[in-house]
């Protein structure tokens, strides 16, 4: 309750929808982030390896660091993401860059809660058809997720599958998913536009795209405080807890290099999604973008 109370005091939420469509959804993307690794410029073919090194380094302490950096608020942000997804029994859902399982576990818990209320605890055929796919390019992150799943009693292949894969070249069939989520992952891909295109491809008509990402603060005074916290405190905590200052320095820099809320919403729209909107949380520290494939 204290955490939710704190979130209520801190959260400055707003929802915005892009009302005017782009000139053409087939227009080539004008912004490429292929050569940025934080504030550094790197060869396009090197970025994936560099990002992989970051997450291999922080995998074992990833969830603990999320708690420390966000003062636990990331849990509420992910709850909000799942609330907007509104998962249902029998759905096929893809969670990309979700290696440690945080989003997938929440989706399954929500589905089980809905099912049990409706069926009074009876497992139905449609529940058995529910499948959540966790896709992550980093095997170390997936191993953390698999261990957590085992501790929660989830058997691999029964409602929950772990796939090592690239957000820019997914192995799933066209129109095979009811939902797609990506939390704190899309800013790390080499080509954001390719990841969005793949998300659009694998979704069914009527499928929902949702992205939870650290974004750009839109409250001037809070922005100054947040900048000091980001560049001074987060890397220091990373060094103290994870023994890795540089990875968390990259984290902070990658947030600043990521497109702002309006630009990213435009990119989602250009990928073909409709009814694109976003919701700022905690004054824009994070934003949840959503869109539908119609």
From Swiss-Prot:
Topology in the lipid bilayer: Peripheral membrane protein
Protein name: 2-methoxy-6-polyprenyl-1,4-benzoquinol methylase, mitochondrial
Keyword annotations from UniProtKB, A to Z: Membrane, Methyltransferase, Mitochondrion, Mitochondrion inner membrane, S-adenosyl-L-methionine, Transferase, Transit peptide, Ubiquinone biosynthesis
SUPFAM superfamilies referenced in this protein's UniProt entry, alphabetically: S-adenosyl-L-methionine-dependent methyltransferases (SSF53335)
Subunit structure: Component of a multi-subunit COQ enzyme complex.
NCBIfam families in alphabetical order: MenG_MenH_UbiE (TIGR01934), PRK00216.1-3 (NF001242), PRK00216.1-5 (NF001244)
UniProt pathway annotation: Cofactor biosynthesis; ubiquinone biosynthesis
Upper lineage: Eukaryota, Viridiplantae, Streptophyta, Embryophyta, Tracheophyta
GO biological process, one term: ubiquinone biosynthetic process
InterPro entries assigned to the protein according to its UniProt record, in alphabetical order: SAM-dependent_MTases_sf (IPR029063), UbiE/COQ5_MeTrFase (IPR004033), UbiE/COQ5_MeTrFase_CS (IPR023576)
Residue positions binding S-adenosyl-L-methionine: 100, 136, 166-167
């Amino acid at each position: 309750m204290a955490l939710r109370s704190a979130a209520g005091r801190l959260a400055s939420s707003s929802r915005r929808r892009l009302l005017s469509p782009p000139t053409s959804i087939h227009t080539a993307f004008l912004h490429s982030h292929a050569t940025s690794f934080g504030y550094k410029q790197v060869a396009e073919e090197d970025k994936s390896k560099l990002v992989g090194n970051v997450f291999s380094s922080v995998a074992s302490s990833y969830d603990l660091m999320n708690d420390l950096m966000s003062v636990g608020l990331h849990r509420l942000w992910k709850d909000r993401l799942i609330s907007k997804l509104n998962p249902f029994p029998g759905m096929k859902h893809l969670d990309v860059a979700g290696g440690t399982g945080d989003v997938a576990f929440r989706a399954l818990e929500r589905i089980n809660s809905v099912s049990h209320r409706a069926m009074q605890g009876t497992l139905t055929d449609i529940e058995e058809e529910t499948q959540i796919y966790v896709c992550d390019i980093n095997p170390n992150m997936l191993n953390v997720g698999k261990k957590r799943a085992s501790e929660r009693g989830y058997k691999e292949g029964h409602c929950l599958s772990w796939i090592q894969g690239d957000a820019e070249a997914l192995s799933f069939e066209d129109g095979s998913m009811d939902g797609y989520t990506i939390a704190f992952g899309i800013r790390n891909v080499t080509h954001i536009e390719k990841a969005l295109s793949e998300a659009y491809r694998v979704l069914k008509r009527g499928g929902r795209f949702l992205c939870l990402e650290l974004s750009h603060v839109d409250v001037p005074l809070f922005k100054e405080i947040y900048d000091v916290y980001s560049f001074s405190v987060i890397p220091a905590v990373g060094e103290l807890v994870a023994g890795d200052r540089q990875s968390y320095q990259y984290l902070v820099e990658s947030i600043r290099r990521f497109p702002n809320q309006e630009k990213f919403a435009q990119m989602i729209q250009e990928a073909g999604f409709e009814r694109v909107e976003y919701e700022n949380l905690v004054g824009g520290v994070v934003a949840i973008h959503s869109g539908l494939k119609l």
